Amino acid sequence: MLFPPGIFSEATAFSHKRSIRSISSHSTFDDVTAETDEAPVLAEVEKMPAVVKKVKHGMRKVLESLGILDSKCEQKKKHNKIPSAAAGDSPIKTFGYPFYDTSLGRSLLRPQVGLSFIEGFMQPIKVGAFDWMVQGTVDDVLSFLVCFDDYEAIAEKLGEDGAWHSEGNIGPLYLQLQNTSQYQGDASSILMAYSVEQILGRIDAWGVIDQTIGHWWKPAASLSEKAKSVYDTYQSLKERVPDLTTEKFQEVWNSASTKSGVGKLKELAKLFTLNPETRDLRDSWENLDRVDRGRKISLYVTSYPKRSRTMATFAFGENRVKLGDMAAAVAAATKDTTLDNLLKKYL
């Protein structure tokens, strides 16, 4: 079922046409396909979105009524204990940072330390160099987010000094929703097309882009492996930075290939600071009709949102967000008639 108009559609957004390319970053996935669609333009806000505030107010009662709350997590909280992923408290297993397992020939999700209570501290999710994701049914994802509702997710941005920053004018943390089946895999087999580590690895592997690789920006069967890898990297970055040109990309790639350590990150940071006006915020979901709540979903947490015809996008007004607020945003996005009626009752 596609998302119907509901009681929380408080804001609209303008869209404009962009050329979007859906691309896999690994050779075992589908070849590059070109698509043209509307990409979100996000309008700035300075406080927690009103839609999140409204839904969060009555969300726990609503989810309890629907039988979505995880009993193990709720019991732990009733005894004044803190749920921890490391202790096995998560109601689902498909969450974390994607990595490609060469022995299995597919990508998996690694939780790492985020959402674990370690040495007296609630370890946050951090995104920037990598995206983080959770997958399952809508009920699965809501149950998971509410279980860890007091944990934080922190968006980091790559600064011109080559370091990752979480303080200052960082910008928003973004949520993106997508149906898992878009990638023709099960709930743990989606390979992310983006990570800073992967980009740097390709620069190290191939070195300077020179005349020997020809027109790398024009995909063709005759392209060398190096040219194809350069093209793939450019396309995965362009999904995050729509105004990136081939000339600027090649300039930064070649400069980064001559640097080491932090020097490489300083060069790469130039790509993510292009046209900052394309990263404005907004206070409501954009393009929810692209996602079917009746099927399994992937929820991405990111600093650098992807422009995709298969994704819905939500931006918070800050870079530190509790998972409880994420749950409210997802609940607002994935509502149906039953949820709408319950929200009206409790709000």
UniProtKB/Swiss-Prot annotation:
Keyword Secreted: yes
Major subcellular location class: cytoplasm
Keyword terms, alphabetized: Cytoplasmic vesicle, Secreted
Compartment(s): Cytoplasmic vesicle, Secretory vesicle, Microneme; Secreted
Residues annotated as transmembrane: none
Gene Ontology CC annotation, any one: cytoplasmic vesicle
Origin superkingdom: Eukaryota
Protein name: Microneme protein 21
Organism: Toxoplasma gondii
